[in-house]
């Protein structure tokens, strides 16, 4: 069987890492050839191991929508693709491509159901002219969230109708999405497949007093500004602790200035790092203060390294990873910054036995999402689609 995944950049982030894990497993199973169609390819990041697991082909940018769609269809025919996995959203005319080529189409949603409602509001505030339009007109239209939600439902329904399978990141999402779209979950083609998490060979339980954020500095979704305000609340009560932020992105300048304005102490901006494992190895706590998350890999990576995850329970995916609350991590009511600060103080005050128990349970929780288990779910989906 030949399967192709459509990405923007490759290999560049969490979704791309998941594709690589799936490809490695299916390569080992045998009978599969995996392709990646990507707009931007980072050749220096394509190790021999990755190249052995899959074949990467370049496609035009989304800015050239018609050219991109035609090239994808040409590659489907050329490579004899049986299943096309569209990461995050459908490509234009996917229904036509399905009819003309006989290829099965999958949409793999890597956010929470109807995640577009957050992006819609954010994009209407990007750029000088859009910000003016936002203040004069759109701010009132989108004030209560109902318009963004309606648009998100319309886009998701279009993606759902034009694919053979729509995957989400946990079973709670499957039920939530079916209800939102008015579809019976028992007859839908929505499938729940979690993100995989690799094993860590040598877990370090001798942690430093470090609270770690690791991710893209994109404040509309990650809301790192909340974490800085929370640190301002607890920094003097935790004099032997530090806050470390790993990553970069458009909000970095604003966040650095905010750290100065709040007079934050023992805070470090580490920038983009190719080796984030060294930070997880040392961190006692991994903190997430996001507005929205699908299945945050930073939390599952934290568990794999024996870190204690703390996050707002903004979505079912976050709750699934950290539950049971207080045993595999800590779930804070969204978006209560005072409660989050209290939770950090609570974690810092854990005795050695309590701390060890939580870290051990977190590591055990990760075993549910080993690449072999998750990739087997993908294999089952692909086999099911070809039988239809």
Enumerate the predicted regions with their spans.
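Aromatic "clamp/platform" in nucleotide-sugar-dependent glycosyltransferases that forms part
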Residues: 272, 291
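Short His-centered aromatic/hydrophobic patch
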Residues: 86-92, 109-112
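Conserved acidic donor-binding segment of nucleotide-sugar-dependent glycosyltransferases
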Residues: 323-338, 346-352
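A short, active-site helix/loop in glycosyltransferases that binds the activated sugar's phosphate group
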Residues: 146-187
């Amino acid at each position: 069987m030949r399967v192709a995944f459509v990405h923007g950049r490759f290999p560049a982030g969490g979704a791309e890492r998941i594709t690589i894990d799936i490809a490695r497993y299916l390569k080992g199973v045998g009978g599969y050839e995996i392709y990646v169609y990507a707009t931007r390819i980072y050749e220096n990041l394509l190790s021999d191991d990755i190249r052995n697991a899959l074949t990467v082909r370049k496609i035009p940018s989304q800015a050239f929508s018609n050219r991109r769609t035609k090239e994808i269809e040409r590659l489907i025919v050329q490579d004899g693709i049986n299943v096309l996995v569209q990461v995050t959203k459908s490509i234009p005319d996917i229904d036509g491509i399905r009819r003309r080529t006989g290829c099965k189409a999958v949409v793999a949603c890597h956010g929470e159901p109807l995640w577009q409602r957050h992006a819609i509001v954010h994009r209407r505030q990007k750029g000088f002219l859009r910000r003016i339009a936002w203040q004069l007109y759109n701010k009132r239209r989108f004030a209560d969230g109902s318009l963004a939600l309606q648009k998100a439902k319309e886009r998701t329904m279009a993606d759902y109708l034009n694919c053979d399978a729509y995957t989400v990141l946990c079973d709670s999402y499957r039920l939530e999405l079916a209800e939102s779209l008015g579809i019976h979950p028992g007859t839908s083609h929505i499938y729940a497949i979690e993100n995989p998490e690799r094993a860590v060979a040598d877990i370090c339980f001798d942690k430093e007093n470090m609270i770690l954020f690791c991710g893209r500095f994109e404040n509309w979704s990650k809301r790192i500004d909340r974490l800085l305000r929370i640190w301002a609340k607890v920094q003097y009560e935790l004099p032997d602790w530090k806050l470390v932020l790993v990553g970069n992105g458009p909000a970095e300048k604003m966040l650095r200035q905010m750290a100065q304005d709040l007079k934050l102490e023992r805070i470090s901006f580490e920038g983009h790092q190719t080796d984030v494992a060294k930070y997880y190895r040392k961190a006692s706590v991994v903190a997430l203060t996001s507005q929205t998350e699908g299945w945050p890999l930073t939390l599952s990576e934290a568990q794999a390294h024996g870190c204690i995850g703390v996050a707002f329970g903004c979505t079912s995916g976050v709750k699934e990873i950290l539950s049971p609350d207080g045993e595999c991590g800590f779930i804070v009511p969204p978006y209560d910054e005072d409660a989050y600060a209290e939770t950090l103080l609570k974690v810092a005050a854990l005795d050695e036995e309590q701390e060890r128990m939580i870290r051990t349970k977190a590591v055990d929780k990760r075993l549910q999402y080993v690449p072999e288990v998750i990739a087997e779910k993908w294999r089952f989906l692909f086999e099911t689609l070809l039988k239809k």
